[in-house]
Amino acid sequence: MKQTVARTLTGIPGLDEITGGGFPQGRVLLVLGEPGAGKTILCSQFLADGMTKFAENGLFVSLEESRKHWIREMVQFGWDFTSAEKQGKFAFVDASPIRTIPGEVKVGKLTIGKQDFSLMSLLEVIRSKAKAIDARRIVVDPVSLFIFQYLDESQSRKAVLDLVEALSETGATCLLSSELRRVGITGRTLQTEEYLVHGVILMQTVPNGSTMGRIIQVGKMRETDIDHQPRPYKITKNGIEVYPRESLAWNLIDMRT
């Protein structure tokens, strides 16, 4: 008899329908998309809905935006992370200095020499914050900035694997965001991080008749009966909305290696 896999409902309209009833609980998944596709919005909405709809505390780890800028952007969608933080339901780790400070890195109260900074150092901060608030949902946005610092592909792969394994050990359902890297105009290659995560969500902008449309697609999701078809989505004043029963008349982008 096939064992039923526990699911984490996202709360995002339409997304649970194309992911077989939510994300596999306690797994690490990748949200892959172009700049402006709404990766950060989707990941933040996953945390916001987790707190308000399912009483699941959340942790956001930013490798790009400062806390101030991120909070200001999320308020536009009606997500009050500041109040949640005061109530102990949410925590923010600002790791954005890793790309701007040449001599040292400061993550929270921890200062690390740039030469000695490693993924494991950051993970110690993540573990500490996640434990402190009993985080059931964790977002790392965007992991691509960390990957880009490794010139050697084997080092990059090991770094991603270390990250995925450490996040899995927290027991939380985790989302990593990463930039979709194109090859030419119409194609792309599978990226290192895709092979190492439990599932992949693709967010793209594609030709839709005489205009452009947004599509979201489940690239893979282990232990899940998923909808592989690209589905349209919109970024509204309330966040991401997926339309699981609709399709676009678009020119398919080659997703093969």
Label for each model-derived stretch:
Residues M1-K2, I226-T257:
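C-terminal regions of RecA-like/P-loop NTPase motor modules
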Residues T10-G22:
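Pre-Walker A adenine-sensing motif
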Residues L29-L32:
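Short hydrophobic/aromatic beta-strand immediately N-terminal to the Walker A/P-loop
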Residues E34-L110, S121:
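Conserved P-loop
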Residues N57, G88-K89, D134-R137, E169-S177:
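Loop/turn-to-beta-strand initiation segments
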Residues E64-K68, Q76, S96-T100, S144-L145, ...:
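Conserved nucleotide-binding/hydrolysis micro-motifs of P-loop NTPases
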Residues R99-D162, A166-S168:
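Phosphate-binding/switch loop-helix module in NTP-utilizing enzymes
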Residues A172-N238:
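Phosphate-binding/switch region of NTP-binding enzymes
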